[in-house]
A protein has these predicted regions:
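Terminal targeting signals and extreme-terminal segments of soluble enzymes
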Residues: 1-167
């Protein structure tokens, strides 16, 4: 996604801070996005540095009532929270040894409360917080917003595991 395309999607004046989030090249996220991401504290990648994700709602995201479909908002929240948890996991853990596998997560539970509706053409954001980590689980919460309006609150737990290379 070019700088001009990003600037056309994000709120005015914020284009240079956002980039396409496609770190894992997930075809589902790519087809339903684009999902953009920014580091809320500059370029320093650390476990405590929060990420914010955003998307511009489109007609394809909406149901017959003209509101962004709750299923898409739930998916967006899961993508945002899982990727924040995975960042926390990979930055806080030592690099895997050869043959050990690649760190990954699976969603164990996901809960969302819808607070307001949003229509097409709106900028929607989600800034997850990893609030607890155990040896095998990460717990994350977030609010989805359009500006200052809260659209949803979400929470999730994820189990960490290593993906073994396919031979």
């Amino acid at each position: 996604m070019s700088k001009q395309e990003i600037e056309a999607v994000v709120p005015a004046g914020e284009g240079e801070r956002w980039s396409l989030y496609d770190e894992w090249h997930d075809p589902f996220e790519h087809k339903n996005g684009p999902i953009l991401c920014r580091d809320l504290e500059g370029d320093a990648a650390s476990v405590t540095t929060p990420l914010e994700f955003g998307f511009r709602s489109q007609d394809d995201h909406c149901n017959v009532a003209g509101a962004v479909h709750g299923g898409w908002l739930l998916t967006f929240a899961d993508v945002c929270m899982a990727n924040s948890a995975l960042r926390c996991l990979t930055l806080a853990s030592p690099a895997p040894q050869p043959g050990q596998g690649t760190p990954s997560l699976c969603t164990i539970s996901l809960h969302m409360d819808f607070a307001d509706r949003v229509g097409p053409g709106k900028w929607v954001t989600c800034a997850p917080e990893v609030y607890k980590r155990t040896k095998t689980h990460l717990f994350v919460r977030s609010l989805g917003k359009q500006g200052d309006r809260v659209l949803f609150s979400a929470s999730a737990s994820y189990r960490s595991f290593l993906i073994q290379a396919m031979l």
